Amino acid sequence: MSMNEQMNHAEENILHTYNRFPVMFDHGEGCYLYDTEGKKYLDFAAGIAVNSLGYHYPGYDEALKSQIDKLTHISNLYYNEPMSEAGEKLVKASGLSKAFFTNSGTEAIEGALKAARKYAYTKYGKEAGKYEIIAMNHSFHGRSMGALSVTGTEHYREPFEPLVGGVKF
């Protein structure tokens, strides 16, 4: 299939959630992406910040392949060595007391909102009314209801209102 045929095929079968650029990537190398016609692009977005290590670095690929051969995701209901080691590194680097792992940025935002509310509830009690989340204008944090509630860009928020309350911009 040509690139245009592939893009049309995707439009027929995949829910349209973003305005996409008219390019279809085939593979990546370092900080570059290559489309199906061989054109090279510098990935300034790093896959919307989830590919900050780039693409196909030998050490990265080897570590992923090694882990895939052993075990993939099993949730945080069970213990596993890589998660314990990563948690220790994060605690040491951050100075915080615990690490919290999630599957996505959306879950990280939801976890942060819940942690802030739980902290205020535990420290001050329900009657203190200290539940407000302060959010930034012109921000974007994801597409879940909690993330949209703290997204300070109206055109993302408006179609899904009413959102989670107690947010101040």
Question: PLM ranges: what are they?
Answer:
Residues 23-43:
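Active-site and channel-lining beta-strand-loop segments
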Residues 136-169:
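PLP-dependent aminotransferase-class I/II
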Residues 40-126, 132:
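Glycine-rich loop-to-alpha-helix module at the N-terminal edge of alpha/beta enzyme cores
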Residues 24-26, 91-94, 125-128, 159-163:
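Solvent-exposed alpha-helices and their adjacent loops that cap or buttress functional pockets
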Residues 1-29:
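Active-site-adjacent loop/helix segments that line or gate small-molecule/cofactor pockets in enzymes
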Residues 36, 44, 104-105, 136-139, ...:
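Fold-independent oxyanion-binding glycine-rich loops
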Residues 34-35, 53-55, 149-150:
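Short beta-strand-to-turn element immediately C-terminal to the catalytic PLP-Schiff-base lysine
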